[in-house]
């Protein structure tokens, strides 16, 4: 039998039909739904007189538009309120069973609450009208974002028209140094391959450093796969995967659990499986990362400098650097550690899980927000994460440091709710995109890990968190 990659196995087990040109009909196991990309899809079903093909495949929540403070006042913005209320009405009308509405204890960012509910299982195909659906590949699943018209198609047919991607292996060899996180690994990979490096590929992350990551770290890594241009990212199933899933509400029980585990243990690339491209990094070389520009590939080590466009021979790249520096208000050759910050955001589907909050709290403990920092938002990824953090006393650490402890939601990851930057404000953010205007018109975003974000909050500028940890 021909050796298969993990992606090959996941793809082949879900193909319903394949045409000669490679176009395939792919069966979808899990459909995650939120309030932003679902209204048009539900409306299309209504107009056509269709129903949800598999009600039990849909898991939904409100996240993008929900406020993260003053929940007692409801949703103030009328457009945001309309989107959330429309989701409420559509879920009721179509009889979807698994819904975590605004203020529900299980509500949260769809890519956080889905896995913690066990709605994401190894071997599944998972889709959502959201580009960071690649997060769920951390479980040995085939997961990717889809457009609004595709959301309707999956709702109506439980299938998706797709073409198979090529296979890429990104291998991180060796062990990560102290203070180096999954976010640093993700940014280092994107810095190496670029934001188009994974275009046309499904990326499997492997190597000793990846196996050493927790499930939460793997979710962070796979979340960022799309920022490297890939359709999806994934990690092979191991004992950590199975232990994470065990006992969660949507996980199999009894004999079905035993059968599932037996299958899940096959979800890894076979020896000798062919990858169309292999990229290797040495874990020992990865340092804390900070983006300086307007794309995740514009990234440097914290001990480095902002690049000088005069040193770039490619005229297109040179122009890109010049434009990014102008937007970001930075001078060439500025040391990263001399860049001050105005706002810090710790949250998003990339870095709002309990492990992320613990890392940030470890830095904040016994310290205070720097005087030049206007605001530090700490936004848990779900109601369950919030409850766990409060049970551990993390909220008290943040508040004592002058940080704001908020309710769950997408928050300042994108300017779609009340949490946003003002023009010219510079933010150390644990989110996944630093595009122009992403966090608010004229806002300047630097992507970092939770620990690095907390370090910037107390130092007032970017600083190597490992120095703070050393005392």
UniProtKB/Swiss-Prot annotation:
Key word Secreted present = no
Q: Which SUPFAM superfamilies match?
A: Aconitase iron-sulfur domain
Protein name, entry field? 3-isopropylmalate dehydratase large subunit
GO terms, molecular function: 3-isopropylmalate dehydratase activity; 4 iron, 4 sulfur cluster binding; metal ion binding
Quote the record's cofactor note: Binds 1 [4Fe-4S] cluster per subunit.
Source superkingdom: Bacteria
Q: What does this protein do?
A: Catalyzes the isomerization between 2-isopropylmalate and 3-isopropylmalate, via the formation of 2-isopropylmaleate.
Do you know which Gene3D superfamilies this protein is assigned to?
Answer: Aconitase, domain 3
Question: For [4Fe-4S] cluster, which residues are the binding ones?
Answer: 349, 410, 413
Tell me which Gene Ontology terms the entry assigns under biological process: L-leucine biosynthetic process
Matching InterPro entries: 3-IsopropMal_deHydase_lsu, Acnase/IPM_dHydase_lsu_aba_1/3, Acoase/IPM_deHydtase_lsu_aba, Aconitase_4Fe-4S_BS, Aconitase_4Fe-4S_dom, IPM_dehydratase_rel_enz, IPMI_cat
Query: Which reactions does this protein catalyse?
Result: (2R,3S)-3-isopropylmalate = (2S)-2-isopropylmalate
Q: Which UniProt keywords apply?
A: 4Fe-4S, Amino-acid biosynthesis, Branched-chain amino acid biosynthesis, Iron, Iron-sulfur, Leucine biosynthesis, Lyase, Metal-binding
Tell me, how does this one assemble? Heterodimer of LeuC and LeuD.
Query: What pathway is this protein said to act in by its record?
Result: Amino-acid biosynthesis; L-leucine biosynthesis; L-leucine from 3-methyl-2-oxobutanoate: step 2/4
Under Enzyme Commission nomenclature, its number is 4.2.1.33
């Amino acid at each position: 039998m021909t050796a298969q990659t993990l992606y090959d196995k996941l793809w082949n087990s879900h193909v319903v039909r394949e045409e000669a040109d490679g176009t395939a009909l792919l069966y979808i196991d899990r459909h995650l739904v939120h309030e932003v990309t679902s209204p048009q899809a539900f409306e299309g079903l209504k107009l056509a007189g269709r129903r949800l093909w598999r009600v039990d495949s849909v898991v939904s929540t409100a996240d993008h538009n929900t406020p993260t403070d003053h929940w007692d006042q409801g949703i103030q913005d009328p457009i945001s309120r309309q989107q959330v209320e429309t989701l409420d009405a559509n879920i009721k009308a179509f009889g979807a069973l698994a819904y975590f509405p605004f203020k529900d204890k299980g509500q949260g960012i769809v890519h956080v609450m889905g896995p913690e509910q066990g709605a994401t299982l190894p071997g599944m195909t998972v889709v959502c009208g959201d580009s960071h659906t690649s997060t769920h590949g951390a479980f040995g699943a085939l997961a990717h974002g889809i457009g609004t018209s595709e959301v309707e198609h999956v709702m109506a047919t439980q299938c998706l028209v797709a073409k198979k991607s090529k296979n890429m292996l990104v291998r991180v060899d060796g062990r990560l140094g102290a203070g180096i996180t999954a976010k640093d690994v993700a940014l280092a990979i994107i810095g190496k391959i670029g934001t188009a490096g994974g275009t046309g590929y499904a990326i499997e992350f492997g190597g000793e450093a990846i196996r050493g990551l927790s499930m939460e770290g793997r979710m962070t890594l796979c979340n960022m796969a799309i920022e490297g241009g890939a359709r999806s990212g994934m990690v092979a199933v191991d004992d950590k995967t199975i232990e994470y899933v065990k006992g969660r509400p949507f996980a199999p029980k009894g004999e079905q659990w035993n059968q599932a585990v037996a299958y899940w243990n096959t979800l890894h690339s076979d020896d000798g499986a062919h990858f169309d491209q292999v990229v290797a990094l040495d874990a020992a070389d990865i340092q804390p990362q900070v983006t300086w520009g307007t794309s995740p590939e514009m990234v440097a080590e914290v001990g480095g400098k902002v690049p000088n466009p005069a040193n770039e021979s490619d005229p297109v790249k040179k122009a890109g650097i010049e434009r990014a520096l102008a937007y970001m208000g930075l001078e060439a050759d500025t040391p990263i550690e001399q860049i001050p910050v105005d706002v810090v955001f710790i949250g998003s589907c990339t870095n709002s899980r309990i492990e992320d909050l613990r890392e940030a709290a470890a830095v904040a403990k016994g310290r205070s927000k720097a005087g030049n920092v206007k605001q530090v938002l700490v936004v848990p990824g779900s109601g369950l994460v919030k409850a766990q953090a409060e049970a551990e006393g993390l909220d008290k650490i943040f508040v004592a440091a002058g940080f704001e402890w908020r309710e769950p939601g997408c928050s300042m990851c994108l300017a779609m709710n009340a949490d946003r930057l003002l023009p010219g404000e510079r933010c150390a953010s644990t989110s996944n995109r630093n595009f122009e205007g992403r966090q608010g018109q004229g806002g300047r975003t630097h992507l970092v890990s939770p620990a690095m974000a907390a370090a910037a909050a107390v130092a007032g500028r970017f600083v190597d968190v490992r120095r703070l940890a050393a005392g």
